[in-house]
Regions:
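Flavin-dependent oxidoreductase catalytic cores
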Residues: 1-233
């Protein structure tokens, strides 16, 4: 068996990566400071992966929302909270990665939904960690606020010099995944019902990022096409 293709460059839109090896998203609190910027540990962590030869590196999920959901106690990765600090650390990180030819796509999430107490969901459904409590349902205005913050974060990331982003979408039961599943989305407006409506949030994020950042800005979307959990498909 030949593995030659794994070591060949790959072009994704305007972004060229030196090989087919990538580092998947990983969330570690130590990689960021209290204001969401990359910490010294974070800079060293990602630089080590680039030095090791990975062509593409994904960050753990950033959570842009500072208006609707409460700040989760273990998640400080909110670029819009202190954008100047975030940009300074990002520029330094990209300089380190460029030395090895590696590219990075920051992952951006619409939110936790039922996975974090106090957060909003597509519908009034039980929280995962405490099913005795029901999560409040997002209003249409709140959905728009969340989408707008996703787009604003993509614009900030482009200004930092990142070639694109990955939207943390239909994966592992987080908010966009909850919107996609009729099992959790009981809405009767434009964001519920038919599959097209349940995917509307993801589509509006994709279209909004492309409109704001340009067609040459790479937008990856993390999708799990099948969930091996009862009632999730």
């Amino acid at each position: 068996m030949s593995y030659d293709s794994l070591f060949q460059p790959l072009r994704i839109g305007s972004m060229e990566i030196p090989n087919r090896f990538c580092v998947g998203p990983l969330t570690l609190p130590s990689l960021h400071d209290a204001f969401g910027a990359f910490s010294e540990d974070g800079l060293a962590y990602f630089e080590a992966r680039a030095r090791g030869g990975f062509g593409l590196i994904f960050t753990g999920a950033f959570h842009p929302d500072v208006l609707v959901d409460p700040v989760h106690p273990y998640d400080s990765k909110q670029p819009l909270k202190a954008p100047k600090s975030f940009m300074r650390s990002s520029v330094e990180l990209l300089e380190r990665l460029d030395a090895y030819g590696a590219k990075m796509l920051p992952q951006v999430s619409m939110g936790f939904g039922r996975n974090a107490l106090g957060c909003f969901c597509p519908s009034e459904i039980p929280y995962y960690h405490d099913p005795s409590r029901l999560a409040p349902a997002l209003t249409v205005d709140q959905i728009h606020q969340k989408i707008d913050q996703m787009i604003a974060t993509a614009v900030l990331l482009k200004q930092c010099g990142f070639p694109g982003i990955e939207v943390h979408a239909m994966h592992w039961g987080y908010l966009l995944d909850q919107f996609a599943m009729s099992f959790m989305n009981h809405r009767t407006d434009e964001y519920g019902g038919a599959l097209e409506n349940r995917l509307r949030c993801a589509r509006e994020i994709l279209d909004g990022v492309k409109a704001a950042c340009g067609s040459d800005f790479v937008v990856s979307m993390r999708l799990a096409l099948k969930a091996y959990m009862k009632g999730y498909n």
